[in-house]
């Protein structure tokens, strides 16, 4: 409480009032969902609270009924397919991750969920009956009396006219007639209803395989200790025999139900061709010639970097002693002997600490088991259940809950049970020493080796090693090759030591895995663990394809943010831990991602919304058993309170002038015209918001006045906040996105004589743990400045209790990672987080999109990516400055004016209550008073019809998927019975067809080994249609595509259509948005109608694989799939020498394209060709990528 008062006094002294970030998100979402013209809210809330509560129960009941129907349809669909699926079940075996095992698991989960939903429905019905028993009874009596009294008038109704009878069904309840929007939002838009089982899984009390025969591995009870008499011996033998029989029966069930099949009849599946390009690796990149002058500049820069403070001698010495003790093999053997002594001590007290045994034979050391939290014990049990299925999984626990401890405990238990094989852990370079330290603490018997230059004690000053995982190359698909300082022979010796040891554990980085893939990818590992595994979220990135070639079926991903942006990223993660579980990427996008995305559009039809819901149900059942995610609030983690404030800072005079000058420049016009990359303009604006001197860094970095805090609004806020925090005894973490901003911050801290430490991509890996240890264990260091991509990943910085996030990131999970560095297990003080955002600028747009993406991520199966492809109006929205125009109205002021009327911004004028930010936005003497809003209770003002553009922008941020899908969902629930049955039936057919297409895609992918990357539409080999390789080849990372066995191709193309009709890349979001904008509801519904006819259409087109034109002309009523159409366009232009006139193209395709699809056709043509005008007229010329 004292800290809260101190914070409030600090903010008031700065002219700032704090805002609770969760309240901001809730208010923004609720404002975006509220109709501005609706003025009936206050009257409803006047005196009808019981009616509102009853309405909420009714809406909840309807949403539960909708989900019951959806889950029941999946069970019925599975049962209907069982008789026809007997023949395929005869082909069971090892290499096919599909069929009976997966179907049995999904059906069991669906049946359990259906039971829980029915219980919830009965409970809601009971609550409804209990809420108003007497009025309902009186209403029934009134209705009965009315029926008796109106006997005579009832005979007069038929002659009145049949028109009224016809019109009555038209008066169905619509959303506009439903004033209880909050009830609709709670009941329908909140996603799937959480059952009791799912709640227990979320709280860490159960595993996803609880009470599923053949999948659950329970803890076996310890055997009784008194066994002297013969009867006890007989019971012991009986128990041992029963245990063996039970294990044998369990293994038999696993062999039968495991999601794998063996194909005995290869003629029943499509054939695959060999890859179009031979398997080869890229050569060394060319080095640009460097002039002597530039070489001297490069030498000067590292000298400047060495000025940063190093860890204290005490901590450097302690860290070097720890590393040398772990590096030295002799000391390692001594450590093993010490652990043996510890084992002797444990055996002395074995009566108390015996091994805990799970079904199947996993023995968890007693000393280890007692140190784990309950949810961590459940995590170890879940990993063992996955091990018995020969499958992998994603540990998606929230940051700070001990994912590393759970993995090491499980690997140690495997070693203790004699089931361990040498394993590999891939992680960012910052976490290498932390992994080694945790491994030596939790299971000292592991012989840990680090495959990285930082572990080489002989090369003390190898600076290049620290650059390999810098934030500059973090998200790059084409990372620079880092020359290893160790000779290849030494790497070979290190790898051979790990592989030959029965307890070897290899730690390396993603970059080293990419460089040394030839050595590491040929080894059969026991386990492959990817820490911060969202690094492979891009399915076509080179590092992703390298990781998917690791030779093991036991794969684990550790990430605190398993779902960040879109469904294709979720596919990439799951395809690593369970190859082929979600099919190939083009089929997954067509059958799941596109329907779910289209169902979330504002103009989605009821059929599209229902289809999206059914597809989401199927996808959830596929994914959830292999994704374990627990939150801090659910597992009763003993953590202190965390509060988060958002401080909106004003631009200084210099910043505002620079910002406006850039917006008026020709460069912005080039961005609007599409002649320049928009990311360039976004980067310039964000630099201006941080500090305008960043634009002149190359020329003015040596100027003594470079980085003056008076020229940056956020720097002035930081200066005042740090001064107060220093006096109050707090310790601070400050995160920025770039090293350049850290340079300015470092100069500022040096001038203010603050004790600080710095860590970024240029910090040598050997110093990072020493820096972290020094900051956590001594109070001398006041502030630790870091970049979010290096210091915000997996590090433990509990020594701080104040965090400043200087600039927001487009990806909310990045800021979330940085925030969780201090608020985690081990923290003893309350944590306060400050986010600094420059008001009215692009940073405010980034922050609002963060809220939007976070809101959609919580719905798990929604795709927030649709706003990532910016159109013209989005660009104009980004490249604007809204600070003192339009009476000082900004997006933020609109939000906070609805939060509270009592907002103190340092200008106590009543006349300016409606212009909260006008005074602080205009230049004042100080120029940069930050402003924010306080969490309060004030009446909410609805935006009028003539609302500002900012209100409309806020609505457009949220009207895309989550909110309006709830509206359409409610319209479906209120539809009449006939229409509802038809919609549900059609949606069920689409969902079942999607599941069938996914099943066939898995069968196709199963031809290849688990170590062959899955086809993504651009890269990979497993499951790729042969026609794609024949026409386009592998357009990316051909060096990572393994050669498969050549096979016959007589029916390759037709069968590729049978697994989803996707040849080539899937429909992009930009094309999809253009299609929906051009054809409104018709185009989207036609696309889904085409999916309804996909199965029958593929049967017709398979017979004409050589000539797609004949089949398409005979089915004119059917819309051609965009992926097929773009391939036909490319083939036609190639046949005409790479160029064709508009007349010839139109003449050729006029009988295939419907009039309402002409806009899609034009966009597809622009995607692969450019229009060139010459003397002979205009011609379309293929782009180089398609020639």
UniProtKB/Swiss-Prot annotation:
Disordered: region residues: 31-53, 75-102, 217-242, 265-351, 457-480, 916-945, 1095-1116
Low complexity bias: start-end ranges: 918-933
Pfam families, per the entry: Helicase_C, SNF2-rel_dom
PROSITE patterns assigned to the protein according to its UniProt record, in alphabetical order: HELICASE_ATP_BIND_1, HELICASE_CTER
Polar residues composition-biased segments: 31-43
GO cellular component, one term: nucleus
Function: Essential factor involved in transcription-coupled nucleotide excision repair (TCR) which allows RNA polymerase II-blocking lesions to be rapidly removed from the transcribed strand of active genes. Upon DNA-binding, it locally modifies DNA conformation by wrapping the DNA around itself, thereby modifying the interface between stalled RNA polymerase II and DNA. It is required for transcription-coupled repair complex formation.
Protein's name according to its UniProt entry: DNA excision repair protein CSB
The organism of origin for this protein: Oryza sativa subsp. japonica (Rice)
Top-level taxonomy: Eukaryota, Viridiplantae, Streptophyta, Embryophyta, Tracheophyta
């Amino acid at each position: 409480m004292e800290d809260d008062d101190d914070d409030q006094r600090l903010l008031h002294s700065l002219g700032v009032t704090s805002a609770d970030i969760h309240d901001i998100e809730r208010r923004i979402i609720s404002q975006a969902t509220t109709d501005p013209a609706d003025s009936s809210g206050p009257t409803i809330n006047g005196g009808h609270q019981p009616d509102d509560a009853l309405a909420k129960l009714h809406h909840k009941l309807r949403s539960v009924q909708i989900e019951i129907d959806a889950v029941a349809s999946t069970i019925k669909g599975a049962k209907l397919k069982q008789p026809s699926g007997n023949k395929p079940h005869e082909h069971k075996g090892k290499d096919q991750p599909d069929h009976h095992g997966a179907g049995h698991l999904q059906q069991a989960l669906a049946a359990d969920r259906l039971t829980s939903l029915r219980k919830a429905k009965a409970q809601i019905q009971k609550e409804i009956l209990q809420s108003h028993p007497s009025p309902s009874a009186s209403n029934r009596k009134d209705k009965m009396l009315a029926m008796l009294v109106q006997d005579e008038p009832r005979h007069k109704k038929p002659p009145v006219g049949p028109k009224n009878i016809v019109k009555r069904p038209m008066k169905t309840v619509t959303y506009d007639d439903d004033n209880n929007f909050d009830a609709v939002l709670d009941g329908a838009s909140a996603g799937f209803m959480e059952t009791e089982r799912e709640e227990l899984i979320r709280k860490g009390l159960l595993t996803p395989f609880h009470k599923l025969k053949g999948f659950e591995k329970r803890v076996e009870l310890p055997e009784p200790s008194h066994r002297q008499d013969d009867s006890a011996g007989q019971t012991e033998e009986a128990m041992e025999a029963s245990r063996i029989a039970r294990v044998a029966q369990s293994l038999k069930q696993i062999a039968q139900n495991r999601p794998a099949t063996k194909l005995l009849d290869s003629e029943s599946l499509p054939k695959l061709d060999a890859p179009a390009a031979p398997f080869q690796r890229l050569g060394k990149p060319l080095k640009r010639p460097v002039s002597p002058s530039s070489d001297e500049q490069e030498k000067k820069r590292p000298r400047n970097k060495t000025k940063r403070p190093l860890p204290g001698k005490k901590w450097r010495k302690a860290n070097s002693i720890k590393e040398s003790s772990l590096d030295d093999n002799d000391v390692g053997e001594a450590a093993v002997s010490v652990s043996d002594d510890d084992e002797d001590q444990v055996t002395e007290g074995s009566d108390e600490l015996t091994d805990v045994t799970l079904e199947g034979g996993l023995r968890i050391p007693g000393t280890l088991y007692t140190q784990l939290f309950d949810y961590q014990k459940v995590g170890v049990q879940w990993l063992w259940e996955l091990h018995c299925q020969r499958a992998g999984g994603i540990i998606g626990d929230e940051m700070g809950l001990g994912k590393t401890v759970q993995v090491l405990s499980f690997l140690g238990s495997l070693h203790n049970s004699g089931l361990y094989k040498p394993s590999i852990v891939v992680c960012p370079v910052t976490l290498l020493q932390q992994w080694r330290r945790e491994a030596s603490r939790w299971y000292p018997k592991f012989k840990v080796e680090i495959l990285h230059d930082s572990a080489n004690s002989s090369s003390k000053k190898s600076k290049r090693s620290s650059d390999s995982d810098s934030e500059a190359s973090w998200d790059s698909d084409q990372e620079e090759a880092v020359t290893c300082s160790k000779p290849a022979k030494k790497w070979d010796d290190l790898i051979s030591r790990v592989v030959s040891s029965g307890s070897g554990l290899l730690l390396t980085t993603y970059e080293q895995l990419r460089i040394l893939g030839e050595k590491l990818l040929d080894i059969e590992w026991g386990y492959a663990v990817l820490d911060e595994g969202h690094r492979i979220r891009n399915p076509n990135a080179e590092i992703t394809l390298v990781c998917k070639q690791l030779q093991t079926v036991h794969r684990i991903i550790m990430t605190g943010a398993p779902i960040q942006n879109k469904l294709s990223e979720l596919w990439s993660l799951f395809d690593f831990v369970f190859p082929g579980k979600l099919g190939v990427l083009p089929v997954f996008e067509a059958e799941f991602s596109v329907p779910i995305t289209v169902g979330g559009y504002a103009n989605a039809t009821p059929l599209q919304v229902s289809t999206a819901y059914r597809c989401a149900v199927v996808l959830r059942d596929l994914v959830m058993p292999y994704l374990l995610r627990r939150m801090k609030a659910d597992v009763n983690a003993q953590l202190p309170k965390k509060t988060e404030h958002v401080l909106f800072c004003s631009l200084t005079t210099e910043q505002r002038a620079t910002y406006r000058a850039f917006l008026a420049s020709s460069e912005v016009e080039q961005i609007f015209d599409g002649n320049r990359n928009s990311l360039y303009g976004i980067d310039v604006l964000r630099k201006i918001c941080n500090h305008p001197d960043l634009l002149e860094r190359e020329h003015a970095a040596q100027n003594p006045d470079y980085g003056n805090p008076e020229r940056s609004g956020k720097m002035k806020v930081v200066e005042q906040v740090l001064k107060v925090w220093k006096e109050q005894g707090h310790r601070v973490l400050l995160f920025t996105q770039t090293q350049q901003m850290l340079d300015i911050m470092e100069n500022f801290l040096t001038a203010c004589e603050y004790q600080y430490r710095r860590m970024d991509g240029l910090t040598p890996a050997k110093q990072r743990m020493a820096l972290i240890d020094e900051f956590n264990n001594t109070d001398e260091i006041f502030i630790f400045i870091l970049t979010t991509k290096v210091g915000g990943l997996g590090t433990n910085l509990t020594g701080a209790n104040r965090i400043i996030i200087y600039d927001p990131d487009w990806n909310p999970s990045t800021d979330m990672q940085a925030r969780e560095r201090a608020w985690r297990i081990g923290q003893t003080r309350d944590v306060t987080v400050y986010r600094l955002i420059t008001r009215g600028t692009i940073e405010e747009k980034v922050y609002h999109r963060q809220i939007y993406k976070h809101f959609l991520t919580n719905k798990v199966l929604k795709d927030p990516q649709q706003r990532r492809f910016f159109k013209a109006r989005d660009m104009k929205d980004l490249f604007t400055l809204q600070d003192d125009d339009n009476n000082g109205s900004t997006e933020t002021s609109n939000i906070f004016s609805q939060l509270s009327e009592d907002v103190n911004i340092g200008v106590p004028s009543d006349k300016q209550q409606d212009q909260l930010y006008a005074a602080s936005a205009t230049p004042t003497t100080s120029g940069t008073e930050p402003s924010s809003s306080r969490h309060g209770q004030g009446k909410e003002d609805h935006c009028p019809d003539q609302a500002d553009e900012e209100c409309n922008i806020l609505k457009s941020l949220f009207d895309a998927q989550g909110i309006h899908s709830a509206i359409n969902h409610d319209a479906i629930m209120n539809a009449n019975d006939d229409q509802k049955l038809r919609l549900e039936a059609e949606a069920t057919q689409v969902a079942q067809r999607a599941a069938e297409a996914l099943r066939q895609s898995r069968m196709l992918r199963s031809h290849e080994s688990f170590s062959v990357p899955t086809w993504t539409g651009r890269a990979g080999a497993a499951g790729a249609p042969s026609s794609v390789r024949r026409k386009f080849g592998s357009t990316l990372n051909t060096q990572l595509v393994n050669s498969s066995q050549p096979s016959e191709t007589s029916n390759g193309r037709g069968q590729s259509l049978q697994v989803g009709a996707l040849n080539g890349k899937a429909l992009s979001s930009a094309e999809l948005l253009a299609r929906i904008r051009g054809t409104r509801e018709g185009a989207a519904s036609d696309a889904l109608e085409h999916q309804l006819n996909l199965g029958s259409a593929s049967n017709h087109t398979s017979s004409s694989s050589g000539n797609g034109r004949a089949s398409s002309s005979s089915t004119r009523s059917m819309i051609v799939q965009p992926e097929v159409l773009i391939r036909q366009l490319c083939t036609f232009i190639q046949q005409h020498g790479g160029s064709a006139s508009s007349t010839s193209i139109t003449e050729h395709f006029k009988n295939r394209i419907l009039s309402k699809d002409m806009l899609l056709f034009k966009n597809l043509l622009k995607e692969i060709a450019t229009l060139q005008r010459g003397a002979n007229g205009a011609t379309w010329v293929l782009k180089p990528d398609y020639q």
